[in-house]
């Protein structure tokens, strides 16, 4: 979460936007009984949908406190290219290169393959089955389901607790909310489509 927040705050300092209230969670079903089986089925539907696309692109909006930033990423296999504000991230599946175009700096880091943080490892941002998260259905109503994901004991994930809202008709994610030590980051998914062009390659020349 620290990496996600530091990147957000860096970008937000460059281009702050007037705050807009975060999207509310979908109201829970009347009985509000956790249903792990249904939650797992929804998670499977979402991850299967992304796998069926093969290479794909996602556009999104991030909200943290009074800041709002839009971004996008493209995935092909374990490789991805992500843009958020003036920053770009290139990843070859093993190493990620964070490029701050304004400061003309490049930070090189090893990929955290176990991360489910959309800004840290977008390849697996919606791949929760078999991960170190316990899933429960927080509510389902009018074609929207809310799945709560809690780190299992021993999971030191940087994403903390996660709330995933899903359009159950299309089995597509609508939003993610990360909650780590009281800090919240809301990510709204604006669009998902098959990738039409090759991933942008890193050039340091």
Q: Could you tell me what each predicted segment is?
A:
Residues 70-72, 86-88, 134, 161-165, ...:
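Short, surface-exposed charged micro-motifs
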Residues 140-205:
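Gly/Pro-enriched, hydrophobic low-complexity segments
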Residues 4-12:
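Sec-dependent N-terminal signal peptides
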Residues 62-64, 84-85, 99-102, 177-180:
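Beta-turn initiation residues at beta-strand->coil junctions
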Residues 111-142:
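Flexible, surface-exposed loop/linker segments and immediately adjacent secondary-structure boundaries
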Residues 2, 15-68, 74, 78-79, ...:
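N-terminal leader/targeting segments and the immediate start of mature chains
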Residues 70-119, 185:
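An acidic-aromatic
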